[in-house]
UniProtKB/Swiss-Prot annotation:
Disulfide bonds: none
Entry coiled-coil feature ranges: none
Disease affiliated with this protein: Mitochondrial trifunctional protein deficiency 1: An autosomal recessive metabolic disorder of long-chain fatty acid oxidation, biochemically characterized by loss of all enzyme activities of the mitochondrial trifunctional protein complex. The disease phenotype ranges from a fatal form characterized by early-onset cardiomyopathy, cardiac failure and early death to less severe, late-onset forms with myopathy, recurrent rhabdomyolysis, and sensorimotor axonal neuropathy as key features.
Name of the featured protein: Trifunctional enzyme subunit alpha, mitochondrial
Stated family: In the N-terminal section; belongs to the enoyl-CoA hydratase/isomerase family. In the central section; belongs to the 3-hydroxyacyl-CoA dehydrogenase family.
Transit peptide, residues from-to: 1-36
Species in which this protein is naturally found: Homo sapiens (Human)
PANTHER family the record matches: TRIFUNCTIONAL ENZYME SUBUNIT ALPHA (PTHR43612), TRIFUNCTIONAL ENZYME SUBUNIT ALPHA, MITOCHONDRIAL (PTHR43612:SF7)
Residues where Omega-N-methylarginine is found: R399
Residues modified as Phosphothreonine: T395
Length: 763
C-alpha cells in the first residue's frame, strides 16, 4: 500500500515541470526595531512572549541570506538567555510572504563544494537549535513558506497559518536542481510520512494551508480578515500575531500540547515503513519511477531519495551529514547552475522594463474565438479584465466561449475555484459577432488565421471603431508586425503579442516591437501580459521573430532525419532523452502539420538555403491527405479521444518511401542526430542575438525553454553554449557543414565565442 501511494504521488513528477515556482508579490510595511543595527530581524516582547519579525530590506520577499542568518541567531540567543521570556512567535512583516527560501544569489556566489556544504551545515545548526528549544516557538505563517522557510517552520514546536490562497508551503529546491539543505529531508518524512514527504520534495509542488493542516504540516488555521480601518493584509497579520501569541502562552503553560493525533491511515503507513522489506520496495519503486521520468538528466531527485533513505536506515546524524554533502554536490552541478540561471531569467522577464503605461488596460477585445483567441480570453477574464470575444460565426463563437468556461470549470474540479468564483469570472466575458463595445476597448488582440490580407482587413475594420488610445496587438507566430502595421493609420499603436498553445498552461508571451511601436504601447502590452501571469520576452520585429525562427531550422532537420529512415518513435525517443519534454515528431503533430508547412514555406522564402534541410514536400503531401496532426486525428501518429497510447500512422509509410534520402553514416549516430537538431536551434538563437532581434541572452534562454521546450537542464541555448563550450558546438557544426552545407555554418558571434574561451554569454 505504501509503495502504491508513493508511486501514485510521483506520477505527477515529469521531467520536468521545471521552474514553475511562483513569484509572490509582497508589500512592505514598517515594524518597530528593537535594535537599529539590525536590518533583517527585529523583536519585541508582549508579556512573556517574544515576537520575532522577519523583514528583509529592499525586497518583496524574505530570503535566508547570510545577514538574516546572523541576525536571527543573535536574536534567538537573546531570547533563550532571557528569564522574562517563556515562548516566542516567528512572523513576517511582509504580507504574502513568510520566508520564500534561501537567497539564490548567496548560493550562486559559492565557488567550491566546501562553501556550499558549509552553508548547509550552518543552516542545519540554527534550525536544530529551534527544534530543541526549551521555550516553545510558534511559526505564524502568512504567504509563501518555501524551501528554507518551511525548514524553519517545521523545526518550530507549533505552526499556525492563514487560510488564504497566497499561503502555500513547499520544498521547491528540486526545481533548482538542489535539495532541502537545512534538515528538511530528515524532518519532513517524520512529520508527514515518507510518501507525502517524497511527493513534496520530488515534485517541488506547493501545498495550500488547508491541505497542509490535513497532512500535519500545520497545526492551526486562521481565517484572513477583510477590510477595516487598516488594509486587509495588515489586519490579517495583526490578527495572526495575536492568535500565535495566545498559542505560544498556552504551550509555555502546558495547556496546549504540540503533539498531533495521527489518523488511522497515517498510523498504518508509519507502521508499514518500520518493516525493512516494505521500505526497500518503496525505495525501489520510487527510484524506478524517477529514473523513467527524468531519463537521468536531473541528478537531484535520486539524491533526495538517497538522503531520505540514509536518515531512515542509518539515523538522523548520518542523514544530516548526507544531506549537507549532497546539497553541496548538487548546487555545484551544471544542471543546478542552468536551472538557477533560468530562475534569474524569470525574475528579469517578470518586470516591465518600459515602466508604467500612461493608461491601464481595463477593457480588452479579442478577434477570433478559435483555440488561441479563446485561450487568451480565458487568461484575461481570469485576471479581472473585461473582455469581448468576437468571431465571424455563431458556431465558432459558441465553441470559443465553451472553451473558456471549460477551462474555468476545470479549476473548480481541482478546487482552485468555487462555482461562484467561476461564474463571477466568466461574467467578465462578452461574446459577439459585431464590433459593438469596441469604442471602449483599451486593447484589441487579433487571433485570426495566419493570412496577411485577412489581418489587414480586420485591422482596418477595427481602427474604424476603436478610440485613439487603443492598442492593436497581433497574435501572429511568424508574420512580420511591420507588414501587418503597413495599413494602419497609427503604426505606433501596433505591436505583436505571440502567445503559445495551450495559452492557459504555457507561461511564455513573446512581445514584438517594430521601429514605429511607441514605448507606451510596449509598456501596455507588457503590463497586460504580466497581469495574465505570463513570463515575457520582448524582441525586435523580423520574420519568425525569435521563437519561430529558432524552431523552424530544427523542424527542417526533423524532416530530413525522417527522410533518412529514422522512424518517428525513435526520433521522439532521441529528442526526449536529450531533455526535450516532447519528441520532435510529436511536436510537429501538436503544432499542426499545416501550421508547420505554412511557417516552413514563409521562412524558407526569406532565409533561403540556410533554412533548408528536409523536403517540405513531405508536409505538403501530409496536408493533402488530411494528416494535420492531433487536431485531425492523424499525423505521424494516430490519435484517439481518451486514449493515451498512440500508434504510428502506417499511411505515412508510402509518403516517407517516396521522399526517402540515403543517410550519411558519418553523421547518423544517435548522438549526431541529437546534435544536428540542437546545434541548428542554438546557432539560430545566437544569430538572433547577433542581429539584435534579442536584447539579452537571458530572454533568449527564457523564450527557448518556456516557449519551445528547450531542455531546462541545459538552461537554454545561451547557457548551454557557456556550459558545454562554444568551441565544441562550433566543431559539431563544422562536422555537419561538411556533410550538408550552409545550413550548419556557425554564425559569427558563436565563432567569436569559440575563438575566445573566456568569452561567455553569462559572466
Amino acid at each position: 500500500m505504501v509503495a502504491c501511494r508513493a508511486i501514485g504521488i510521483l506520477s505527477r513528477f515529469s521531467a520536468f515541470r521545471i521552474l514553475r515556482s511562483r513569484g509572490y508579490i509582497c508589500r512592505n510595511f514598517t515594524g518597530s526595531s528593537a535594535l537599529l543595527t539590525r536590518t533583517h530581524i527585529n523583536y519585541g516582547v508582549k508579556g512573556d512572549v517574544a515576537v520575532v519579525r522577519i523583514n528583509s530590506p529592499n525586497s518583496k520577499v524574505n530570503t535566508l541570506s547570510k545577514e538574516l542568518h546572523s541576525e536571527f541567531s543573535e536574536v534567538m540567543n537573546e531570547i533563550w538567555a532571557s528569564d522574562q521570556i517563556r515562548s516566542a512567535v516567528l512572523i513576517s512583516s511582509k504580507p504574502g510572504c513568510f520566508i520564500a527560501g534561501a537567497d539564490i544569489n548567496m548560493l550562486a556566489a559559492c565557488k567550491t563544494l566546501q562553501e556550499v556544504t558549509q552553508l548547509s551545515q550552518e543552516a542545519q545548526r540554527i534550525v536544530e537549535k529551534l527544534e530543541k528549544s526549551t521555550k516553545p516557538i510558534v511559526a505564524a505563517i502568512n504567504g509563501s513558506c518555501l524551501g528554507g522557510g518551511l525548514e524553519v517552520a517545521i523545526s518550530c514546536q507549533y505552526r499556525i497559518a492563514t487560510k488564504d490562497r497566497k499561503t502555500v508551503l513547499g520544498t521547491p529546491e528540486v526545481l533548482l536542481g538542489a535539495l532541502p539543505g537545512a534538515g528538511g529531508t530528515q524532518r519532513l518524512p517524520k512529520m508527514v510520512g515518507v510518501p507525502a514527504a517524497l511527493d513534496m520534495m520530488l515534485t517541488g509542488r506547493s501545498i495550500r494551508a488547508d491541505r497542509a493542516k490535513k497532512m500535519g504540516l500545520v497545526d492551526q488555521l486562521v481565517e484572513p480578515l477583510g477590510p477595516g480601518l487598516k488594509p486587509p493584509e495588515e489586519r490579517t497579520i495583526e490578527y495572526l500575531e495575536e492568535v500565535a501569541i495566545t498559542f505560544a502562552k498556552g504551550l509555555a503553560d502546558k495547556k496546549i500540547s504540540p503533539k498531533r493525533d495521527k489518523g488511522l491511515v497515517e498510523k498504518l503507513t508509519a507502521y508499514a515503513m518500520t518493516i525493512p522489506f516494505v521500505r526497500q520496495q518503496v525505495y525501489k519503486k520510487v527510484e524506478e519511477k524517477v529514473r523513467k521520468q527524468t531519463k537521468g538528466l536531473y541528478p537531484a531527485p535520486l539524491k533526495i531519495i538517497d538522503v531520505v533513505k540514509t536518515g531512515i536506515e542509518q539515523g538522523s546524524d548520518a542523514g544530516y551529514l548526507c544531506e549537507s554533502q549532497k546539497f553541496g554536490e548538487l548546487v555545484m552541478t551544471k544542471e543546478s547552475k542552468a536551472l538557477m540561471g533560468l530562475y534569474h531569467g524569470q525574475v528579469l522577464c517578470k518586470k516591465n522594463k518600459f515602466g508604467a503605461p500612461q493608461k491601464d488596460v481595463k477593457h480588452l477585445a479579442i478577434l477570433g474565438a478559435g483555440l488561441m483567441g479563446a485561450g487568451i480570453a480565458q487568461v484575461s477574464v481570469d485576471k479581472g479584465l473585461k473582455t469581448i470575444l468576437k468571431d465571424a460565426t455563431l458556431t465558432a463563437l459558441d465553441r470559443g466561449q465553451q472553451q473558456v468556461f471549460k477551462g474555468l470549470n476545470d479549476k473548480v474540479k481541482k478546487k482552485a475555484l468555487t462555482s461562484f468564483e467561476r461564474d463571477s469570472i466568466f461574467s467578465n466575458l462578452t461574446g459577439q459577432l459585431d464590433y459593438q463595445g469596441f469604442e471602449k476597448a483599451d486593447m484589441v488582440i487579433e487571433a485570426v488565421f495566419e493570412d496577411l490580407s485577412l489581418k489587414h482587413r480586420v485591422l482596418k475594420e477595427v481602427e474604424a471603431v476603436i478610440p485613439d488610445h487603443c492598442i492593436f496587438a497581433s497574435n501572429t507566430s511568424a508574420l512580420p508586425i511591420s507588414e501587418i502595421a503597413a495599413v494602419s493609420k497609427r503604426p505606433e499603436k501596433v505591436i505583436g503579442m505571440h502567445y503559445f498553445s495551450p495559452v492557459d498552461k504555457m507561461q511564455l508571451l513573446e512581445i514584438i516591437t517594430t521601429e514605429k511601436t511607441s514605448k507606451d504601447t510596449s509598456a501596455s502590452a507588457v503590463a497586460v501580459g504580466l497581469k495574465q501571469g505570463k513570463v515575457i520576452i520582448v524582441v525586435k520585429d523580423g520574420p519568425g521573430f525569435y521563437t519561430t525562427r529558432c524552431l523552424a531550422p530544427m523542424m527542417s532537420e526533423v524532416i530530413r532525419i525522417l527522410q533518412e529512415g529514422v522512424d518517428p518513435k525513435k526520433l521522439d525517443s532521441l529528442t526526449t532523452s536529450f531533455g526535450f519534454p516532447v519528441g520532435a515528431a510529436t511536436l510537429v503533430d501538436e503544432v499542426g502539420v499545416d501550421v508547420a508547412k505554412h511557417v516552413a514555406e514563409d521562412l524558407g522564402k526569406v532565409f533561403g538555403e540556410r533554412f533548408g534541410g528536409g523536403n517540405p514536400e513531405l508536409l505538403t503531401q501530409m496536408v493533402s491527405k488530411g494528416f494535420l496532426g492531433r487536431k485531425s486525428g492523424k499525423g505521424f501518429y494516430i490519435y484517439q479521444e481518451g486514449v493515451k497510447r498512440k500508434d504510428l500512422n502506417s499511411d505515412m509509410d508510402s509518403i516517407l518511401a517516396s521522399l526517402k534520402l540515403p543517410p550519411k553514416s558519418e553523421v547518423s549516430s544517435d548522438e549526431d542526430i541529437q546534435f544536428r537538431l540542437v546545434t541548428r536551434f542554438v546557432n539560430e538563437a545566437v544569430m538572433c542575438l547577433q542581429e539584435g532581434i534579442l536584447a539579452t541572452p537571458a530572454e533568449g534562454d527564457i523564450g527557448a525553454v518556456f516557449g519551445l521546450g528547450f531542455p531546462p537542464c541545459l538552461g537554454g541555448p545561451f547557457r548551454f553554449v557557456d556550459l558545454y563550450g562554444a568551441q565544441k558546438i562550433v566543431d559539431r557544426l563544422k562536422k555537419y557543414e561538411a556533410a550538408y552545407g550552409k545550413q550548419f555554418t556557425p554564425c559569427q558571434l558563436l565563432a567569436d565565442h569559440a575563438n575566445s574561451p573566456n568569452k561567455k554569454f553569462y559572466q
